């Protein structure tokens, strides 16, 4: 393999890593490389050490899904499918559903042959439900919605020096998949050039906002810990692996 092909291969298939905190410091390193390294429950820090462009954006998204342990789009579609069924049953028998709750609703079946895939990819609409929906609670046996224990995803962009239009579109779609299943997404250490490009290309909207960007990884982590104070009592995950 010549140098050009070798460089292309490295850029298109970079070594992505999951970071965690070295105890007692504001340093974050690959959790595979240390014996005693900590990460809060419900938080994942993902780093990609290269520019992002058309040739590696899908690789990046696949590695991110491997890191978090689930496909956010699949989760979103499952939730929307369940909500569609709930709302249809509420319309058919409102009083019965209020008396018997969620399990009573799912004792019936509905025709799902007319499911529109585009609708399934949209944000879940919980308005109008007579109960508070908790997707991580025990659900009826005839409904399968993957459990998501992740509440915060931090993306380390310190090595992302370039982002082309194709990658920008793919990144935006991928981030929305997480946001729509109630995972807070943060981007840290982003190059000023990249931020300017995001503004120019209309990257930001009602779902993806500038407030998700933090100057450093530790700043983002402090924000997450403050936002989820109640989770501190649940402790930290300790990694005992070493390369």
Q: Residue locations for each model-derived region?
A:
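C-terminal helix/juxtamembrane-tail motif
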Residues: 228-243
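Flexible, disordered linker segments and immediate boundary regions flanking tandem C2H2 zinc-finger modules
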Residues: 73-79, 209-211, 234-236
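Short acidic-hydrophobic, aromatic-tinged amphipathic segments that line or gate anion-handling sites
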Residues: 206-224
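The feature marks cytosolic C-terminal regulatory regions of anion transporters and related permeases
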Residues: 1-201
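Short, hydrophobic alpha-helical segments
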Residues: 68, 224-228
